[in-house]
């Protein structure tokens, strides 16, 4: 196997037992593909599919006027290039968008001859702005990065369920069905406790279902024929003869003696008819059975009975037979009657009873009844009734099942999946009711609504399309009204179309929808997880309050589709999920997961993606099944999942049809980063997966020594690490950019063969963490497409590195690690292991006020020169200035209203011309509790306002940087061109040239080197073809230079034009501060196994427990945190990390002793290739082996994949390899090498028992004490209660609540209590007085009436109760 440029620098030793057959798919594919399909920007118009924007346009257009004379047709659309790139949008606070323009055709027909076209106008119309997705799957909206989270909602289709006996006190199951369209009215069918079947539309008033059946044109006879089988009777003078159907009699009690055709009694009266009786009757050839009169009474007629002579209706279908009715029938000479066959077990009389409740006579009456239910109080005219009925379920404009809905309806009703319209059909309604009645009769199963075959994912593209369609339909209404005027007023299409509704719908969705979220950008993992999130909340989804336990629970169909571990703790648990590692969406929006095909117990290389519906048909084995070298399943019984319930059973290998592609396929990206996940309790694994997302990127990232092998995928797919777009040679590198000369075979003709990567330097993320990229390549390095060439935040050599590898000891230490506290060595802080940089953005705006414009200036009165020292002449702080709380960053003055002056002040002003007091100082200062270094300043100026010097210098720097990029590209393009020219010209004959080159002479290399390269074009070759080539190269270079000049001009224009600022703002200045945060007591830390704690003390190195060779521990954790939490994975990680560190030390010692490459290779082979995955070390050269060894000095990184990780014996083997006997003795290790004798740093004495010691990857979480620490002496008060505000953001006070008052009451501290409730809180006069007293040096208080008491009195008065206070 070939290693990439970065992989071979540090190979991760993997313990995986199973080879990967299927690579982890690109982790952001769902987001990016969905939005690409929505826009179809790159697809030529003719080849666009009917989805996304195209589908929305096709659905709304053509639009016809009310009189039908004018219509507007849609031709095509295109998206223009975005005016600003992503970075510029972030800086300026703009949306990264593209203008959507649609070409529409207005066709006007002749008024006299409507069939004839009078005129056609075609025009391109602006249709609003569509936000574009960045390359990493996010959106920049108003300058901030946002993510549109996918939504998991109930799929359109038909669903059958029951109420689980909760509705009625008897516990009877009430069955119901619901037809849910993608757009349109919901149709519900439900049984009531009396077994009458009702329907309701959009949860309105319920009505008997037969009304709906009559409204679609069925008569009562037809309704009964659809739902019942009939008994045929032939009437006789006394009683009747029943046509014998054997099955129908079984289980009934005979109400009379039943005889066969010979008159022999087979069943006596009052005996239950069993299978033997049926057989006897059958074998005797009984066709008819004589039944007495009372057997007929109470039965229900199946058809209308008409008098053969008169033609009048004697009895209606669904009438009960009575003695009178039977007499009438006999009199009319009716011989044959049909009745409904019903019984109590599996053929209930439900539809017959429902027909009795229904009072409507025919189709018209039924439709009027539905109209009255939908529009109560409106008079039902025939047209209105018809229009409403059609619009409910049969109109494509208002009702849409969608392809998914039609597929689901067809599969549930047992029809071929492709056929049927997108609106509801009569058969759909009838079939649904039939299945529902069958369910009530005990046949069939209800649906499981939590099954992933019944829930589908709506991605960004689909959500955006729905919004766009909503906006477009608003436009349609307006256009329809104005189309009538198009002919008379000679209007063009752009006069008719107003794009505002579209823009506002899109803006509202991206800006304030519940699914459009502020991107979590703490580290690369949190970014990628946010984009892979699936939420059941949001518009059209569930609400937190209504969601029960079942929806939140893990369902068997989640396997390989949705992660069972990663979900938030708290009210959203189970409603917000993460996609599993290999999951993807199919064309219908259902989640699919890959399985490897198994044929005759042998694994094949075919991988199929199955949705939850398809998977139910197959037997699927788990990835941990034993497989021999040829890929055969060797166990006698294999654990597999089968059936619709997906229950795990033991099956024989020949029955297995599929097998999982990888053990990690059931978990998400975050959970698959937890090593030894299989040894952790599920609750702690959940915390571990969630807390990795909160890890703050450290100043010096450190790859985890014990990983899972997925770290590189996450780092690369998140877009944090920079990948080479094309292979080539590194031409130039500095901290800001990398220039790569592209390989000839990858360069496209006529295009610059140069890739320039501008690295992100010290940029603020959404969570104020620092995003900074560092190059990893040197000039001359050969890189291939996809190689990592620069590390980003929290990445180390292209691998995700969220924390630091720490030497951890599990032991109590003087109570400092009680209750999950963490004891840290001073060395960790001194080495800046957990130091992180946070970037704060502070901004100030200068507005145009009523009294005059605010001004950003250095000239501020009443400020000492020392406070202005950091400001330049424009009044803006220098880059690099160290600032603390209260320092001025940007000087600003605001005009204030004229105040009344005393005569003395007037005199002074007249003498000295003092004008400064007309303005007040409103400068931007560093907020309290913050200090740092200014790293960047940006100045935005409104169009038409002259720029200050600082703003101009910022623009000049930006242009200089841009020019540098262009020069680099030009240099490489010219270099390539001249190299090609040199090859062409050497040894060619000429007709003349510069430096008196004689005719017929041959060009030499020396001659070309002697003259200026640009003079080569003056050479006149004898060969005309060569002369043409020379001219072509010259033109190509000039063309490129011209293009670059144009690009530079464009950039300059963009920078020098005025900035778009909010109304009333003249100038805006943004100052970026870099704040360095060291680890300190109160900071929250965690491992990857849900083992979290707070730093309690930072102890001097000399006091930390140390080993026999003097190595002190970095962190001391409490061993009691492990057993009750059951996250044993952390112990296994500690042991394996200890082995990794030991192996690194061994390699380091070999390099120190200058061992030969062959010796190093031997040790590496022992480490890498004696268990687990075999690495191809022979493919590396000696220098590469030594570079690899150099990178392994701090520890050999291990990969222990989830559910396929290192076993105990493998960990032991690694420990034995890392610590041979002499080293183990020197370090004081026990025989198992998993524990060590430690010594107390303060006394030097050995601890009583050996201590578990090893290396664990620990994270610093984004809950820093600096952000929470807060103190206040005086500050703002609430207006009404006059009590201090609360919270750090408001600079609030500490709440002295009810319980604290009880405490003081209990102690009898009455004076303390009095001042707490009065002068320290809301006694306005009292607190002013106290301040005066303190100033005077008197320490006494005079407590008055608290303001909140006055508020209480006012509230009581508002109830009409007057309270007067009498003072005694």
Swiss-Prot record:
The gene is rpoB. GO terms for biological process: DNA-templated transcription. SUPFAM superfamilies: beta and beta-prime subunits of DNA dependent RNA-polymerase. Belongs to the RNA polymerase beta chain family. This is DNA-directed RNA polymerase subunit beta. It comes from the Bacteria. It catalyses: RNA(n) + a ribonucleoside 5'-triphosphate = RNA(n+1) + diphosphate. DNA-dependent RNA polymerase catalyzes the transcription of DNA into RNA using the four ribonucleoside triphosphates as substrates. InterPro entries: DNA-dir_RNA_pol_bsu_ext_1_sf, DNA-dir_RNA_pol_bsu_external_1, DNA-dir_RNA_pol_su2, DNA-dir_RNAP_su2_dom, DNA-dir_RNAP_su2_hyb_sf, RNA_pol_bsu_bac, RNA_pol_bsu_CS, RNA_pol_bsu_protrusion. The RNAP catalytic core consists of 2 alpha, 1 beta, 1 beta' and 1 omega subunit. When a sigma factor is associated with the core the holoenzyme is formed, which can initiate transcription. Keywords: DNA-directed RNA polymerase, Nucleotidyltransferase, Transcription, Transferase. Its EC number is 2.7.7.6. CDD domains: RNA_pol_B_RPB2. One of its GO terms (cellular component) is DNA-directed RNA polymerase complex. HAMAP family: RNApol_bact_RpoB. GO terms for molecular function: DNA binding; DNA-directed RNA polymerase activity; ribonucleoside binding. The lineage of its organism: Bacteria, Pseudomonadati, Pseudomonadota, Betaproteobacteria, Burkholderiales.
